[in-house]
Design a protein with these regions (language model features):
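Glycine-rich FAD pyrophosphate-binding loop
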Residues: 5-25
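Hydrophobic anchor at the start of a short beta-strand
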Residues: 11, 98, 178
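Short glycine-/acidic-enriched loop or helix-start segments at secondary-structure transitions
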Residues: 23, 84-85, 189-191
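Dinucleotide-binding Rossmann-like beta1-alpha1 core, especially the glycine-rich loop
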Residues: 28-109
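Flavin-dependent oxidoreductases
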Residues: 44, 165-220
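Glycine-rich nucleotide phosphate-binding loop and flanking beta-alpha elements
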Residues: 81, 152, 185-187
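Helical element adjacent to the flavin cofactor pocket in flavoenzyme catalytic cores
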Residues: 119-173, 177, 181
């Protein structure tokens, strides 16, 4: 929506609930690229997206308003992660994006004792995802309609017609183009019946902070 709005396109966002909920509503997020140890098309896409996202974050959200350019330290918490990160570290073309660090170097970067080696992403960042989502949606060319559950999308002559329900009332919206961003929830739309959606459950945990957590100088 923001990319289209930046190009002068008037955008209407139909949000099933309130903006920046579900995965976008996580209290904390880390910006880095979880890439494979060997070059793939997905790796290229992820690295391009990582660089673009980092630049966009700089441009659209003041650092004091929900993010911190502190770097991300990806620790080798098991043998599989250690092998993968060692292979990544040997890819010299990406040495400016990340580098391998031993436990002592990791401890110096983090500001607390670390017993694992890892991969250091100096341009990585910690962020509060809802703050960024709401900043992007605040663009003057974007109209946000919350609690609007889309029930059907149909093509009518030279435009698309979206049927949605908001607070118990039925509404219809006409649009020249439609971008579906509902993830696995899009499967309920008749237009997408039969598409191979695969819901993947995510989970985050929270814990009380201690003295060491308050001394951290980077994201782990």
């Amino acid at each position: 929506a923001y990319a289209l709005a930046q190009r002068g396109v008037a955008v209407t966002v139909l949000e099933a609930g309130k903006a920046a909920q579900a995965a976008s509503g996580n209290r904390q997020g880390l910006l880095y690229a979880k890439i494979a140890a060997h070059p793939t098309a997905q790796t290229k896409l992820l690295l391009a997206g990582y660089g673009y996202s980092r630049q966009l974050l700089d441009l659209t959200l003041p650092e004091s308003h929900g993010w911190h350019a502190c770097g991300v330290l990806h620790l080798n918490h098991n043998a599989s992660e250690e092998r993968r990160n060692q292979q990544l570290a040997q890819q010299h073309p990406h040495s400016t994006l990340y580098q391998a660090v031993n436990a002592a170097e990791a401890s110096a970067l983090a500001g607390v004792p670390i017993s694992h080696s890892g991969l250091w992403w100096p341009h990585g960042a910690w962020l509060h995802p809802p703050a960024w989502v709401n900043a992007l949606l605040a663009h003057p060319h974007i109209r946000l309609v919350e609690y609007a559950r889309v029930e059907d999308v149909e093509r009518h002559h030279n435009h698309w017609q979206l049927s949605y329900r908001q607070h118990g009332h039925a509404h219809i919206l006409a649009a020249s183009h439609v971008v579906l961003c509902g993830g696995a929830a899009s499967a309920h739309l008749p237009l997408l019946h039969g598409w191979p959606f695969q819901p993947i459950r995510g989970q985050t945990s929270t814990a009380r902070t201690g003295v060491l957590a308050q001394q951290l100088r980077c994201a782990l």
